[in-house]
Design a protein with these regions (language model features):
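A short beta-loop-alpha structural element at the N-terminal edge
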Residues: 5-20
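Conserved GNAT-fold acetyl-CoA-binding loop/helix
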Residues: 23-49
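A short helix-loop-beta-strand connector motif used in the catalytic cores of GNAT acetyltransferases and
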Residues: 47-62
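Conserved beta-strand in the GNAT
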Residues: 62, 68-77, 93, 98
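Conserved acetyl-CoA binding element of GNAT-fold acetyltransferases
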Residues: 84-101, 127
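Conserved acetyl-CoA-binding loop-helix of GNAT-fold acetyltransferases
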Residues: 99, 105-118, 137-141
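Conserved beta-strand-loop-alpha-helix junction that forms the acyl-donor binding cleft
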Residues: 104, 125-137, 152-157
Length: 165
């Protein structure tokens, strides 16, 4: 499928589609969140998506198929973001990787991961809710392994995964 995919930076007009895709992707997990733990907050906020698109601190990429966004990724290797997530310098932290349900298991997520510039990186890091088994399986198949080192409270609801570059 790679030959028909277009990887590009998003524009302001993409924010609405990206937001809806994020909302659709996370909505199944919001209904099972009965925990009051602040460590299990899934944020669905259009302003956050706008930040990913507009702020230079983030790398944001979209994948298009036939002029339609099939998936997108946002992350950063900037100190400001890495320190906020407890990551070491030299990492790239994935804030979001979202694939439209119609395009899952078709290589879109892997295509997005390959779009991350690897220069001077030591690892790619992502946090995902334990209940999102589909995401965990995707990351494991992509070479990510579960890592420890954060608070015990974090690991009650989330898992951190890392892949050496």
């Amino acid at each position: 499928m790679d030959s028909s995919l277009l990887l590009r930076k998003p524009v302001d007009a993409d924010v609405e589609s990206m937001y809806i895709m994020l909302e659709n992707s996370l909505s199944p997990y919001l209904t099972v969140n009965n925990s009051s733990s602040r460590n299990f907050q899934l944020i669905i906020d259009k302003n956050v998506v706008e930040d990913y698109v507009k702020r230079d601190v983030y790398l944001c990429l979209v994948v298009e198929i036939n002029s339609e966004i099939a998936g997108w990724l946002a992350g950063s290797s900037k100190t400001e973001v890495l320190s906020a997530h407890g990551c070491s310098l030299g990492a790239f932290y994935i804030e979001e990787i979202v694939v439209d349900s119609r395009y899952r298991r078709k290589g879109i997520g892997s295509f997005l991961l390959r779009g991350i510039p690897k220069d001077r990186l030591k690892a790619i890091v992502v946090d995902t809710p334990l209940i999102n088994k589909e995401a965990i399986t995707f990351y494991e198949k992509s070479g990510f392994v579960k890592v420890l080192g954060l608070s015990e409270e974090f690991y009650k609801t989330w898992t951190r995964m890392s892949k050496p570059v």
